[in-house]
């Protein structure tokens, strides 16, 4: 585990919650600038969800939802991770994703589900965000 203090080590990567509220693209750029190879977090296994949820619940100071690195760039329900990893696991909240009013193309962890379930949201919304890095 080479993760710095207050980062969550998991499956060879390190995850950190940032409480500053940013639009989705700005959050992704922040993660990329933090260190080469960093992105908004991708989640791949059922087992990763509770660990990430618990970490966010412990460290997230605000009440906001939390951006992860999943988005629908083509706006056709073909969800992709910004780190280009395969979209092999999805954990949507009920009745999601819905592209509500055809405006929701970025994915957040939903606070009232304890950050376990996902919702598609307007990408310009300001949320806290979860970066993942290799150290």
Curated annotation (Swiss-Prot):
Tissue-specificity statement: Expressed by the venom gland.
Keywords for the protein's UniProt record, in alphabetical order: Antibiotic, Antimicrobial, Calcium, Disulfide bond, Hemagglutinin, Lectin, Metal-binding, Secreted
Molecular function, one GO term: carbohydrate binding
Record: residues binding Ca(2+): 96, 98, 104, 119-120
Protein's cellular compartments: Secreted
Domain of life, per lineage: Eukaryota
Function of the molecule: This lectin displays hemagglutinating activity on dog (128'000 HU/mg) and cat erythrocytes, that is inhibited by beta-galactosides (D-galactose, D-lactose, and N-acetyl-D-galactosamine) and EDTA. In addition, has been shown to hemagglutinate promastigote forms of Leishmania amazonensis. Also inhibits Gram-positive (S.aureus ATCC 25923) (MIC is 31.25 ug/ml) but not Gram-negative (E.coli ATCC 25922) bacteria. Is a calcium-dependent lectin.
Subunit-level organization: Homodimer; disulfide-linked.
Name of this chain's protein: C-type lectin BpLec
Organism the protein comes from: Bothrops pauloensis
């Amino acid at each position: 585990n080479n993760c710095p203090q207050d980062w969550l080590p998991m499956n060879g990567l390190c995850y950190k919650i940032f409480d500053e509220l940013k639009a989705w693209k700005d959050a992704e750029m922040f993660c990329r600038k933090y260190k080469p190879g960093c992105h908004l977090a991708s989640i791949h296994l059922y087992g990763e969800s509770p660990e990430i949820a618990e970490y966010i619940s412990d460290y997230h100071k605000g009440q906001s939802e939390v951006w992860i690195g999943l988005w629908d760039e083509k706006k056709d329900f073909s969800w992709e991770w910004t780190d280009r990893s395969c979209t092999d696991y999805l954990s949507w909240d009920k009745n999601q994703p819905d592209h509500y009013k055809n405006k929701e193309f970025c994915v957040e962890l939903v606070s009232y589900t304890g950050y376990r379930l996902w919702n598609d949201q307007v990408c310009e919304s300001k949320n806290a965000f979860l970066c993942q890095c290799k150290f």
